[in-house]
A protein has these predicted regions:
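Alpha-helical membrane-anchoring segments
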Residues: 1-218
Length: 218
């Protein structure tokens, strides 16, 4: 019952100022808060939301644009003065040809693969610790690079979530029919239907709710 007032307040405020809804990361914290209202399957709900966020973020990196993100994020990092040779290697022919190099393309492909695969790895018992280590690795990489427009507390939260939800606990797949219909409905809508509509009609669905953080309508 304690989680319902914040959810109700968010639902009331959001239509009047949608910035509140996006700044609150309702597509992540809001879904998780709702899952906590169900004592019998809260852990499953939190795990599914986290897997959905990772998978959506990974899929949104697919395409030719993400390699430019890797180059610019690395070059604008506070750590940039410590790795000049690496930064030059990210360009095809620094300083005359600033296009992403093969190294940059490989790094972007690895980042895309890592974030897309970390959810399934965490959900599968024998590989869950590998998934946790992978999650800690790429969230730490993003955090220490301090990229523009990136919410760093989200990376810290995801690292904590990886350890607690999949390191401390195994994937809590409930028996068939054990998930409350309300929770199942919200998870289906929030993690499948809304992102699918957002992929088909990106101008109509906010990029966070469509799980398009790297391909969104900012």
């Amino acid at each position: 019952a304690e989680v319902l007032p914040p959810l109700a307040l968010l639902a009331v405020m959001a239509p009047f100022d949608f910035v509140i809804a996006e700044c609150s990361r309702a597509e992540h914290y809001g879904y998780m808060l709702f899952a906590l209202a169900f004592s019998d399957s809260w852990l499953f709900g939190l795990q599914i939301v986290q897997i959905g966020l990772w998978t959506g973020a990974g899929v949104s990196k697919l395409g030719p644009r993400f390699k430019y993100t890797v180059v610019n994020m690395s070059c604008n990092s506070p750590l940039a003065p410590l790795m000049p040779s690496f930064l030059r290697a990210l360009h095809t022919g620094f300083p005359t040809d600033m296009r992403p190099s093969r190294l940059a393309r490989a790094a972007s492909a690895f980042g895309t693969c890592a974030e897309t695969c970390v959810g399934p790895l965490c959900a599968f018992g024998p590989t869950r610790y590998l998934g946790v280590v992978l999650a800690l690795g790429f969230h730490s990489f993003i955090f220490f690079h301090l990229p523009f427009a990136s919410v760093q507390e989200w990376n810290i939260f995801c690292m904590w979530a990886a350890v607690y939800l999949f390191g401390v606990h195994e994937f809590a797949l409930p028996p068939s029919g054990a998930v409350h219909p309300a929770l199942a409905t919200v998870l289906l809508l929030g993690l499948v239907v809304v992102p699918a509509v957002g992929q088909l009609f990106p101008a109509r669905v906010p990029f966070l709710f469509a799980f398009r953080p790297y391909a969104g309508n900012w």
